[in-house]
From Swiss-Prot:
GO terms for cellular component: cytosolic small ribosomal subunit. This is Small ribosomal subunit protein uS3. The lineage of its organism: Bacteria, Bacillati, Mycoplasmatota, Mycoplasmoidales, Mycoplasmoidaceae. Part of the 30S ribosomal subunit. Forms a tight complex with proteins S10 and S14. SMART domains: KH. Belongs to the universal ribosomal protein uS3 family.
Amino acid sequence: MGQKVNSNGLRFGINKNWISRWTASSNQQTATWLVQDEKIRNLFFINYRNAQVSNVEIERTQTTVDVYVYAAQPALLIGSENKNIQKITKMIQIIVGRKIKLDLTINEIGSPMLSSRIIARDIANAIENRVPLRSAMRQALTKVLKAGANGIKVLVSGRLNGAEIARDKMYIEGNMPLSTLRADIDYAFEKAKTTYGIIGVKVWINRGMIYAKGLNRTPAHILHPQKKQLKTPTIKKTNSVIAKQKLTGSDIETASLKALTDNNQNHE
């Protein structure tokens, strides 16, 4: 099951919080709010790609909408003299309606290389810029593992390098327990638009295990840092001849007698 389903959806309600949190009063309102949430997310993911938006969470009541944006470069969303954020607020207000009270919060993420969406977008951008596929995937693997991830899996599908027949290419590094529900697996999918067609990019990142109860937004690699390995004790070298040379039987007897004599003198 872990290999088939969306890794985020499998963990919602267990160790991941829902990205849309609201209760609609009717089926019609449910459909309306779902479309609005998708438009709000596309506003950030498509129009503000340079800001490296990792996630957009939305909370609603009947009269209010709270939008939480997590980005690697929030300054690009805010803009000089708050011009961009004012523009974004107006666009979201048009989507949800003028009568709804809107609250927009922009947060900076500490480890952008541990976000699957940012990594997938980087690979898609590299493919669109005609970077060799193998090097683009290898660079992504190296960045993620250096950032402290326990494992990463990358799957690219489509007409790779302009081939006539579509195929898949996959790289896996480290540990990737997709069926372990307490594992903090972050999954994202992006599209690279090329002259040969659309190439799909899927990224899974293993950020460690979550043992705490409840829905915690703090990444596992911060909650449970890996223990440092203890250094092996060093043995001090002695100045005795026995430790440095191969000794004969008579030499060993002489050395042991000398050690006994020194011992007796110390006791006296």
